[in-house]
Amino acid sequence: MAALRQIAFYGKGGIGKSTTSQNTLAALVELGQKILIVGCDPKADSTRLILNTKMQDTVLSLAAEAGSVEDLELEDVMKIGYKGIKCTEAGGPEPGVGCAGRGVITAINFLEENGAYEDVDYVSYDVLGDVVCGGFAMPIRENKAQEIYIVMSGEMMALYAANNIAKGILKYASSGGVRLGGLICNERQTDRELDLAEALAARLNSKLIHFVPRANIVQHAELRRQTVIEYAPDSQQAQEYRQLANKIHANSGNGTIPTPITMEELEGMLLDFGIMKTDEQALAELAEKEAAKAAAATA
């Protein structure tokens, strides 16, 4: 059996990280790969499309009901979904109480100790990436996830989060084997999005793994709690996810140590690509619009 590949999908909240990861994993299982998902996002939506259900019970919530995590059995926290994909959700505490990362640590330790990592080809961590705090960095810090894939778009905050995640990877790259596998751009139809994604990947000493086009069929599938792979297997969007899965499958051992950039460099990139305008440019455009309005009013 080939060596276990531990991959992680990081990205800012709302970027479509969980949707992208579940569609990619559904395509990977078509390649004959055995997969375990460890959801590390407090929203606990990392397995919804694979299980065709509202939301899976989390390790932390089940442990609270049972008394402690030691009172749980593996079958309590692990459900089997699409084509045999094993699904677990770490969960998090009540809002405003405690550290959400604690659930990640507790869940991973429990799963490892109870044999969840046996007889799988991939373990996939789906991790919130707005803030790479100690808890959410746990799959990186504890040398669990070896390949990190950052889901981003051409929007400013998605780029900012991607650069922040790269900083987190760099911090632990020397002490462990974690590497940046690449960037996945979820199209938001912003100006020059593909060019910007490729440029950021190059600046981070990485590559753009795949550019996922925006398509309404993704939302249609989500409303039915399904991946596009299951809902519309013959669609063009399903083919996009299969291409992404194939690229990740072929990317073993090709990860890099990232080279994060400064905020000034990031803003400079946005200016270079015409995404972010200087104050002078913005004022000139505003003056032009006002002049056009005035001319129209007097015509």
From Swiss-Prot:
MF (Gene Ontology): 4 iron, 4 sulfur cluster binding; ATP binding; metal ion binding; nitrogenase activity
Name of the molecule in the record: Nitrogenase iron protein
Functional description taken from the UniProt entry: The key enzymatic reactions in nitrogen fixation are catalyzed by the nitrogenase complex, which has 2 components: the iron protein and the molybdenum-iron protein.
Subunit comment: Homodimer.
Cofactor detail note: Binds 1 [4Fe-4S] cluster per dimer.
InterPro entries for the chain: NifH/chlL_CS, NifH/frxC, Nitrogenase_Fe_NifH, P-loop_NTPase
Free-text description of this protein's post-translational modifications in UniProt: The reversible ADP-ribosylation of Arg-102 inactivates the nitrogenase reductase and regulates nitrogenase activity.
